[in-house]
Amino acid sequence: MSRYTGPKWRISRRLGVSLSGTGKELSRRAYAPGDHGAGRRAKISEYGMQLREKQKLRFTYGLTERQFKALFNKAGKIRKGTHGTNFMISLEQRLDSVVYRLGLATTRQQARQLVNHGHILVDGKRVDIPSYSVQPGQVVSVREKSKNILPIQAAIESVVARPQFVSLDTEKLEGSLVRLPEREELDADINEALIVEYYNHLG
């Protein structure tokens, strides 16, 4: 299944989550798209709730279903902690997610593009794979020739606060995943237990 490239605002309103991270999609019309979006929503089934929760998280991180499920299955092999929480943490360890959390990009999509285009280094070596799993202590930096490109500079200037599990030297544009995030530091609007139930239901 290919990555969704359609209108993000429409998907945001349908799922009730801001895919851009700005919240603008929901500020005007917080209901689902369509002629009857503002009306009373039909009650959805338990399976429907599980599917919607899975789609919310998948679209938030911009992954294909294949990428999403592969990481979900990998997280299930981690012995410590719960499957759902480990999955959420694994999503945050993706290089594009770390670049986004460091404030080197304003959206995860932009962070993915920076990685794809070779602007990002890990421990001094170029890594152009967005799904690369960053480990605590690894140094994530911007390539010297890329430090002055406008999107990165604009992103740095727009940062209000960074999560405590990452750290960035704004002069060197060099940072790291200080530690793995705690569940309470991640998206509170996601019920990962429903996602686990969804995949368990599929078998």
Curated annotation (Swiss-Prot):
CDD domains: S4. GO terms for molecular function: rRNA binding; structural constituent of ribosome. InterPro entries: Ribosomal_uS4, Ribosomal_uS4_bac-type, Ribosomal_uS4_CS, Ribosomal_uS4_N, S4_RNA-bd, S4_RNA-bd_sf. GO terms for cellular component: small ribosomal subunit. SMART domains: Ribosomal_S4 (SM01390), S4 (SM00363). Residues 93-153 form the S4 RNA-binding domain. Part of the 30S ribosomal subunit. Contacts protein S5. The interaction surface between S4 and S5 is involved in control of translational fidelity. PANTHER family: 30S 40S RIBOSOMAL PROTEIN, SMALL RIBOSOMAL SUBUNIT PROTEIN US4M. One of the primary rRNA binding proteins, it binds directly to 16S rRNA where it nucleates assembly of the body of the 30S subunit. This is Small ribosomal subunit protein uS4. The gene is rpsD.
